[in-house]
Amino acid sequence: MNRIPIHTLLWLVTMLFLSGGWSTAQHSNLPICTAQNEQLFPDIVSDGNRGAIIAWMDARNGNRDVFIQRIDAKGKTLWKEDGIAICQLPGSQGWPILIPVSDNNGTIFVWRDSRNGNPDLYAQRIDINGTELWEKNGIPICQNLASQDDPKAIADGEDGVIVVWEDWRNNRQDLFAQRVNGKGEAIWSKDGVAVYDGAGDQYDPSLTTDQTGGAIFAWWDISTPEWRVFSQRISADGRKLWPERGLTVCEANGNQGGPSVISDGSSGAFIVWSDYRNDPAIFTTSDLYAQRINANGQRLWNPDGIVICDQMENQQQPFITHVNHGIGGIVITWWDDRDVFSDIYAQWINGDGEPMWALNGLPICIAEGEQRQPKLIRDKSDGTIIYWLDYRGDYGNKATSAIYAQRIDKNGRSLWALNGMPICLADGGQMTPDAIMTDNIALIAWSDGRNGDSYDIDIYADLILLNSKITE
């Protein structure tokens, strides 16, 4: 295999900004919504045509509503200026989630809604022209009189969606889920089926496809003396396929929490979590562990999980993606306190549970100051783009973050500038970035405080045009 010099590798991927709305001037970016008051928590999904659809929570009318916008591959907004309102009923609507549909004709939009007083969950389908296809103001996912919180959603593979949430109908925090088809019809029981409704409280549900119309779920549970991570598989018709009270993901002593789950491509899943088995106090120093579970609910790796990182100090907020379309294992990124201030690290774990990069992870960004909330997307060339909030040079004087990103190849080599390249350095700070790949374009959206008013946050976006292939 021919290898080219590292200085050449650094030029293999050139960041190009397209014409027609996307500016190369630092701090400009593309305004998606600059309406009055705050716009928060953008979620982005491919429109199937090299562009993107972006949704957000919006307070322009005083209370919080949900809005949506579409942009093309040149950064041109295609719908109404400052977005289309999806729901503006009394009460609060927020926490938007967008799910792609297989025919590339728009998206399914899920949100949390208090129109009835207590928080419920609703959904709407939007076509490529911004037209609502289901009932005006959305169809109910769950309207139980108790509260429904922290929704997560995935595509069901058949133009529908599966949603999971935390639910208080039993006077404790349980987990329920619902499947809705492409026509907006609930397939499972009214107000959802129980993923787990036993003793104690369950937190932070995560889900992934089982590739047969159902889903695999992961969560952490405080009903046991030590907090545990559990998993469950529910079939396309809403039946539990694993133990009634869930499968124990890790049997090690100590507490576990904050799991993330992703398909293994064989109707099973990879699960990553924060692990406190080596914590000398309580929830002060977390390690990161992982497990693979097959379609039958059997653990394939060590019953205690395999180590991603067990450095001294604290590792948190793991975020995962596949290595490639053939799965190939998972790439994990996290923030890491091993060097006083938190930095960004990453690791590739193959399908057999073996770390493929440096022990305890590769440094992605070790710049001065804090780096937090890393996320990542696969770049379709067996590489990965990692992006994060960055406080380099800010040791608490401003407490405002920029957004940086790094691209790494499958060997873990950084392809962009040391410690990442800036996506946005505008004054006022950036929050909650979310990104997707569409062909060879990375699209990223975020909430932005550049206008200087902490109560008037806007939505901005930018793109990076990548070369189509990383050379070995």
Q: Where in this protein do the model-derived segments appear?
A:
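Bacterial N-terminal signal peptides that target proteins for export
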Residues: M1-L10
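Bacterial N-terminal signal peptides
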Residues: L9-G20
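Extracellular, repeat-based ectodomains that mediate carbohydrate processing or recognition
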Residues: W22-E472
